[in-house]
Amino acid sequence: MEYTTLGDTGMTVSRICLGCMSFGSSDWREWVLDEEESRPIIERAIDLGINFFDTANVYSDGESERVLGNVLADYDRDEQVVATKVYHRMDEDDPNSSGLSRKTIDQELEASLDRLGMETIDLYQTHRWDYDTPIEETLRALYDAVRREKVRYIGTSSQWAHQFADALYASDRLGLERFVSMQNHYNLVYREEEREMLPLCAKEGVGVVPWSPLARGYLTRPHDEFLETVRGEYMDDSWAADRIDIYRANGGTEINGRVEELAAEHGVTMAQIALAWVLHKDVVDAPIVGTTSIDHLEDAVEALEIDLSDSDLEYLEEPYEPVAINGHE
């Protein structure tokens, strides 16, 4: 396993972050694994040297946090970097169970700690931008969480670059904790973050932890085969349909074909080529890889060993055309 520090912090993380959205309960999404099925994957990740785990309170309505916490309880907590997120509605009857107000952050942080069975969260991230709460209120609540030793670092996810710049400026102006990481939507078939967000992160020393580096599985197998998978069928009539549509549009299908071609040339899987491309980006610290299979997890780790040439990178990138901004909702 390769390791790096997260942004300008001194915290060391594995270059592969295990995404835990697929662990929890199939009552939430049909492709999600329960604890018994999830445990071997998380344990294998630790065996492979992964020390960075990302979840969110909303994943499986909290069950993902509980599953992750139960498995990690069998290991040395100090050796793991645990990240979770807050923003989305957790209780239909409680309007304060969503957003980024002080009240929401305080109560949802305690709920996450309880489900994880931990005293401190290493990286507590805001899941989306809250248009109803001043960023200063959010930052003060997060600052207080760090002072109370409930949280070590704060991060954020999926927003406009001007919003992120506002947040960083507010932290500096008020002497509050700064966001140290950006979890954003970035892969070979969705590169809009290269325009403003990634240069901003590089300039400000913010760690980049991309979600969906394999385009929700679209870059793991040929286009037509993907549409026949459970997730491919699921996307056609779901909340994620707009995302797979943008992957297929404006050069995406051709990029999928080129990933398949290079995978054959290198004697590796399509997923490994797509992930190697993300890992070759200097601004990226650790892509978040979600999986329901130990084999696929091992494939992801092996992608660290793939050396793509400049011509390979150019060949993969050349068909890309701009698409609408996606993932900020």
Can you annotate each of these PLM segments?
Residues 1-80:
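N-terminal binding-site loop/beta-alpha segment at the start of enzyme catalytic domains
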Residues 8, 47, 69-81, 113-117, ...:
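Acidic (Asp/Glu)-rich catalytic clusters
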Residues 21, 56-58, 85-89, 126-129, ...:
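Active-site beta-loop-alpha junctions enriched in small/polar residues
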Residues 23-36, 92-103, 127-132:
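Active-site mouth loops of central-metabolism enzymes
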Residues 32-45, 100-116, 164-169:
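Short, acidic/polar
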Residues 75-99:
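Structural motif corresponding to the early beta-alpha repeats
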Residues 113-132:
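Active-site groove signature of glycoside hydrolases
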Residues 133-318:
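Beta/alpha (TIM)-barrel catalytic core signal, keyed to glycine-rich beta->alpha loops juxtaposed to Asp/Glu
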